[in-house]
Swiss-Prot record:
Compartments where found: Cell inner membrane
Predominant localisation class: membrane
Pfam family, one: MatE
GO biological process: monoatomic ion transport
Topology in membrane: Multi-pass membrane protein
Protein name, as recorded: Probable multidrug resistance protein NorM
GO MF: antiporter activity; xenobiotic transmembrane transporter activity
Species assigned in the record: Bordetella parapertussis (strain 12822 / ATCC BAA-587 / NCTC 13253)
Keywords, in A-Z order: Antiport, Cell inner membrane, Cell membrane, Ion transport, Membrane, Transmembrane, Transmembrane helix, Transport
Known role: Multidrug efflux pump.
The UniProt record lists the keyword Transmembrane: yes
NCBIfam families for the chain: matE (TIGR00797)
Residues annotated as transmembrane: 20-42, 57-79, 99-121, 136-158, 165-187, 197-219, 250-272, 282-304, 325-347, 362-379, 400-422, 427-449
Recorded family membership: Belongs to the multi antimicrobial extrusion (MATE) (TC 2.A.66.1) family.
Length: 460
């Protein structure tokens, strides 16, 4: 390929990745904003309600995120079918329908576990009064799981068709619905009963139902999606495609669970160190979570772009799609890392009154954690981008093993050792997380570089 032609191809791919990735980043941030609005309303109920909601939310997240990973198989399977250009409409329809089946199938045991959330929290030695409040909250919040997983399936479908903006607009509307629902149900406005913490759970469930119904409306009414007839005979089982879906999705779910639960475990370690460490950790991890949404959205775009090229059997385009996404994601995280190093006080001030002398210790600790988080950002971005690129090649089982090794085999043990044995305390926990993420990032990128030699490109 002539140099000018190659340069033009790279520019086109960079523009296409950015056009696809930006709405996904914004949608992810909008979904985070729903959680933030819940915290704001619950915080007005008092510290005990806030603590109970945090307990419940941690359990909900641990269960929900496995399902999130499971239905994430939708995007690479649909993208591959579109790239292959065979019997595309039927193939895409089969995949999306089985994604919806998967959302329902997983939600049944997931909701059963959440229904017994109080018993689970008591079993892990949480305070009985907090466990009781968290259990009541979870019995309301659990109804958000089925529509949320269904929303993710339909969002993956429109994303694979490279039309992600509708999902972002619906997510914005859901934020408004969530705020209104909290105002009505938490405090008993407009004649509704004041349900407190339970009201916050119901508001989230109703807003999430709105997310799903909004996406149903889009795929049924928009002519670009309507021709796929996704809901015709949706109750008809397709066992072969369901098995293929779970074969690809189960490792994604497991890898996602490994990552989410290591952060839950890190919070427990911080709790053992003391209240100031835990408070500083909560602030630093919230900042890191917001910036993580950027490479996470770009990684979702990478899955689609790589998947299209993989289905079309275009190895050069596979490489362009992967490296363009990687460059965008790492570039964004480098900016985030610089901000954490140069202006930590500005970031912390969004969560803490840094002028209050009573907060001096938490400010000092949070600033130290953000210094480690600057490195953390780069490797966290690299690992999620690597996973997204490999997912586009339908490579999920080996990355799952990498996640298990990096997070639980190396990251958590090294964090505990540095925190308690080396005396690094909270900085040790964060350093352990960074070490684990760095290992996963190196392994993911090594596999991407060896994608042809290990036979990933020959499976299309």
């Amino acid at each position: 390929m002539p140099r000018s032609t190659a340069r033009a191809a790279w520019k086109r791919e960079l523009a296409a990745t950015l056009a696809l990735g930006l709405p996904l980043v914004l949608t992810n941030l909008a979904q985070m904003a729903m959680t933030v609005t819940d915290v704001i309303f619950i915080g007005r109920l008092g510290s005990q309600a806030l603590a109970a909601s945090a307990l419940g939310a941690n359990l909900f997240t641990a269960i929900e995120f496995f399902g999130l990973g499971l239905v994430a198989a939708t995007a690479p399977m649909v993208a591959h079918a579109l790239g292959r250009r065979g019997n595309t409409v039927r193939d895409v329809r089969r995949t999306v329908r089985q994604g919806l089946w998967t959302a329902v199938i997983y939600s049944v045991p997931g909701c059963l576990l959440l229904w017994h959330g109080e018993a689970i929290l008591l079993a892990i030695d949480q305070p009985p009064e907090l466990a009781a409040q968290a259990g009541a909250y979870l019995r309301a919040l659990m109804w958000a799981m089925p529509p949320f997983l269904g929303f993710l399936v339909l969002r993956s479908f429109v994303t694979a068709l490279q039309r992600p903006r509708s999902a972002f607009l619906i997510a914005l509307a859901a934020i408004v619905l969530n705020v209104f629902g909290n105002w009505v149900l938490v405090f008993g406005n407009l004649g509704a009963p004041a349900l407190g913490l339970v009201g916050a759970g119901l508001a989230s469930a109703l807003a999430t139902l709105g997310l799903f119904l909004g996406m149903v409306g889009v795929v049924c009414l928009d002519r670009r999606f309507r021709r796929y007839h996704l809901f015709g005979d949706v109750w008809q089982p397709d066992w072969q495609r369901l098995a293929e879906f779970w074969k690809l999705g189960l490792p994604i779910g497991a890898a996602t669970a490994f990552e989410v639960t290591i952060f839950n475990a890190a919070a427990f370690l911080m709790g053992w160190l003391g209240e100031p460490e835990l408070a500083a950790h909560a602030i630093a991890i919230q900042i890191a979570s917001v910036t993580f949404m950027i490479p996470y959205g770009i990684a979702q775009a990478a899955t689609v772009r790589v998947g299209h090229a993989y289905g079309a059997r275009q190895p050069d385009q596979v490489a362009r799609a992967g490296w363009c996404a990687f460059s965008l994601g790492i570039g964004s995280m480098a900016i985030a890392a610089a901000l954490m190093l140069l202006a930590p006080g500005l970031l912390v001030s969004a969560f803490l009154d840094i002028g209050d002398p009573a907060n001096a210790q938490v400010l000092r600790l949070a600033t130290a954690y953000l210094a480690v988080a600057a490195l953390f950002q780069i490797v966290d971005g690299a690992q999620v981008l690597g996973a997204g690129m490999l997912r586009g090649l339908h490579d999920t089982r080996v990355p799952m093993l990498y996640a298990a090794l990096g997070y639980w085999g190396v990251g958590l043990p090294s964090g505990a050792a540095l925190a308690f044995w080396a005396g690094w305390r909270g900085v040790g926990v964060w350093s352990g997380l960074a070490i684990g993420l760095a290992l996963v990032a190196v392994l993911m990128m090594q596999r991407w570089l060896r994608r042809d030699r290990v036979g990933l490109l020959r499976r299309a």
